[in-house]
Structures are given as structure tokens and as C-alpha cells.
Amino acid sequence: MDLVLDAMEIRVLGSLIEKELATPEYYPLTLNALTNACNQKSNRDPVVAYDEASVASAAARLVEKGLVWESGVSRVPKYEERFTHERSLVPRESAVLCVLLLRGPQTVGEIRGRTARLHDFANLEEVQAALDNLVEWGYAQQLARMPGHKESRYRDLLRGEVEAPKGPADLKLPDIPPIEIARIEKVEAAVERMQKEIEDLKTAFETFKKQFD
């Protein structure tokens, strides 16, 4: 496809799609919340440590490309993604694309396991159907099966087309155990709630101060 994003833009877009599906009550995201989402330790490959200025720059580029919208209604600007809405993707397709953006190439089984928080797929056939649609529309690509592997993997095409890896260099470290992921996600959700409460308090305080200006 003609649209090619860099690694930071991919992370920002993927994080926005994820939060819209997983925690809509805290969406759209402030710059602080978006930065934290990009830097999550769970459900990210690779794990990164972007600063707010870099995330703001990437978000601005996505706004220019029409993939993200920056809301200026509230005192604190907030970001929301437009990609899935402009292209009329349904939740199951958005969920699959999201994990491809955040985790890189994966098998159908891996995708189903990693989309559990985003969409309830009844079986692998539903995941495959969503993937087939994304491939047909030019948003995903099926990679050649690696030697010694039974299943093919899929990757997103928003970062451009690349040749499928041909050797063991593509091997990844084992995933974090599910019980540990659940614990981390609970902590991250609690942090998000506290950050939103702090932002609400700041807004209320600014409003209170204006009464005496």
C-alpha cells in the first residue's frame, strides 16, 4: 500500500486502537496517557521508552496523514485514531490489525490469544476471516512459512512490505506468562485511572483559580 509509517507512528496508532477497544472509558487519550500506552511493558514488541515530545511529534505526523485526530475541546488536547473508522473496519478487524501493529508478525493462534482483551473471537476461523479481509484490502500480508514451522505468520503492511525472514534470527524470546500479563495489566489500568483522576483534578483546580483572576 502507498501509506508507509515509521516505527514510532506504528506504535502510536496501534496504542490508540488498543485503548479505544480495551478501555473506551479512558479514551480518547491525553499526550501523557498516550505516551504511557506506547511504553507499556505488556503486549508490546519491542518494548520502548519514548518521551512525550517524541510521541507528540509522531502523533502530529499521523494527524497530517489523516490517521489521527487531535481534539482541542478540553483544556488538555486528546488524541483518537481515525484509521479504522475512515476505512470502516469492524471491531474484529481492528483488533487483529492492532496486535499486528503492536507485536509484529504472528500466527493465527497467537493473534487469537493476544486479541482476547479487544474482541471475543469464537474460534480460529473468525480470526482467519478477519485476516483474509485485511490481506484483501492491503493492510496485512501472509509471510512465507519458515523452515521447521507448521503455521504461516501474518504482518501488517502499514510499515511497508518486507521479505519474510528466512532463518533463526527471527526467533523470539518466550512470551510473558498469562498470569503475569494479567497482573501487569491490572496495575497499568489502575495507573491509567489515577492519571485520569489527576488530570481531572488539575482541570477543576484551573477552573477554581479563574474565579479569583
Set out the residue ranges of the language-model regions.
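Eukaryotic, polar/proline-rich low-complexity intrinsically disordered regions
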Residues: 1-10, 22-25, 43, 48, ...
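Positively charged, polyanion-binding regions of nucleic-acid-associated proteins
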Residues: 6-25, 87-104, 136
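Short acidic, hydrophobic short linear motifs in intrinsically disordered regions
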Residues: 23-49, 105-121
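A short, conserved structural fragment
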Residues: 56-59, 63-74, 131-146
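Short, amphipathic alpha-helical interaction segments positioned at domain boundaries
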Residues: 74, 81-110, 152, 156-182, ...
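Extended, charged alpha-helical interaction scaffolds
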Residues: 83-130, 138-141, 145-147
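Helical coiled-coil/dimerization "stalks"
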Residues: 114, 144-158, 199, 203-213
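Amphipathic alpha-helical oligomerization/assembly segments
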Residues: 173-211
